[in-house]
Regions:
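Compositionally biased terminal segments of proteins
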Residues: 2-219
């Protein structure tokens, strides 16, 4: 068993693909993400969390307007069941009425079936919201199939896409925010990363690892 102690509150069991994270308190972003993930876990839906929230989850000091979830495609009735369960837990559907079966089905046909993302809000909050989409590309399926399990405070379970893919993908857009996220994750998990895997994704996405050092020197 290979376990890396990343920091005082993070341990990474590489062999099991599991990260143990202890947080003194959960942020609003955390609570919303955990509740949404709990619903997916309960229904057995395969998913991963991608993009900015992953860095925030591990302590990057910034806020995000959205939390990105990507799942295996859902059948229409599965999506209906999912939405009704989310409704009971306080979520709202931006593109439709989460309390109406016909509205949920219209959103499914008009958005998810056509490859568009949809958004959910929680309670009276506008931000952060959940951006929800279903996998379409091999890269998206890879992120789900090889997701890591993060166990937060020994009670919450959330799946994230592989760190190597997250870092490479964050370098691809080249925005300051994305570069900052990539530097944060790379610096934090450097000892535990599969560097061969990281270089594979850097090559696939045609980005240079030196961008991490350049971006890091700015911060």
């Amino acid at each position: 068993m290979t376990v890396f102690v990343i920091s005082d509150n993070i341990a990474f069991d590489v062999d099991r693909g599991t990260i143990f994270l202890e947080k003194s308190s959960l942020s609003e972003d955390d609570r919303i993400a955990m509740l949404f993930a709990e619903t997916l876990n309960e229904l057995g839906v395969r998913y991963s969390v991608i993009a900015g929230y992953v860095a925030i989850l591990f302590g990057r000091a910034r806020r995000s307007d959205d939390i990105d979830f990507i799942t295996y495609p859902l059948a229409e009735d599965e999506f209906l069941k999912f939405c009704l369960l989310l409704r009971d837990r306080g979520f709202k559907l931006v593109q439709g009425d989460i309390g109406s079966e016909s509205s949920i089905r219209k959103v499914y046909e008009g958005y998810l079936e056509r490859g568009f993302s949809i958004r959910f809000t929680y309670g009276d909050l506008i931000l952060p919201n959940i951006e929800f989409k279903t996998a379409r590309s091999p890269l998206q399926y890879y992120g789900i199939d090889n997701s890591l399990t993060v166990i937060v405070n020994k009670e919450h379970l959330i799946k994230i896409a592989p760190l190597e893919l997250q870092i490479a993908y964050k370098l691809y857009p080249e925005s300051e925010k994305d570069l900052g996220d990539a530097v944060f994750l790379y610096t934090l998990f450097r000892q535990a990363l599969n560097h061969q895997e990281l270089h594979k994704w850097l090559s696939t996405l045609r980005v240079d690892i030196s961008m991490l050092e350049v971006a890091g020197s700015r911060g």
